[in-house]
Amino acid sequence: MPSFDVVSELDKHEVTNAVENAVKELDRRYDLKGKGSFEFKEKELTVNLTAEADFQLEAMIEILKLSLVKRKIDAQCLEIKDAYASGKLMKQEAVLKEGIDKELAKKIVAHVKDAKLKVQAAIQGEQVRITGKKRDDLQEAIAALRAKTFDMPLQFNNFRD
């Protein structure tokens, strides 16, 4: 029986490239030159932003989002934490979310069932496997999932006949 997996993954190499591009953009901007920094921690998938003022942090977040989108990474995976003061500097953390949590998996399964397609959806850890009798049914399921916006970017992989 044909099947495919619904996942939410990040290409860590592309994220690294996006952060490096954001650092270059930060150096290019006259209003932010030498006043802020990005620090990417690959293991925790976090980006620490440091700046002198709150408005500079907001501009840096926009630069980071723009860099992610240019590298074809959905900005929805970015979770921005609250800014806090640390001495003379303002700091903020941006966490990159990866994987489908149980709540989102339940929403995906419910959406597939509500679409009344001839497919079955099963939660398997951080992914959802969708199985059907025909390839056309699976393509309809993909179209239904793409039409609805979830709070995480979804990818479809492991398509098997």
Curated annotation (Swiss-Prot):
One of its GO terms (molecular function) is nucleotide binding. Signal peptide: none annotated. SUPFAM superfamilies: YajQ-like (SSF89963). CDD domains: YajQ_like. The keyword ATP-binding does not apply. It holds the Pfam family DUF520. The keyword Membrane does not apply. One of its GO terms (cellular component) is cytosol. It comes from the Bacteria. Keywords: Nucleotide-binding. Belongs to the YajQ family. Nucleotide-binding protein. HAMAP family: YajQ. This is Nucleotide-binding protein PFLU_4927. The lineage of its organism: Bacteria, Pseudomonadati, Pseudomonadota, Gammaproteobacteria, Pseudomonadales.
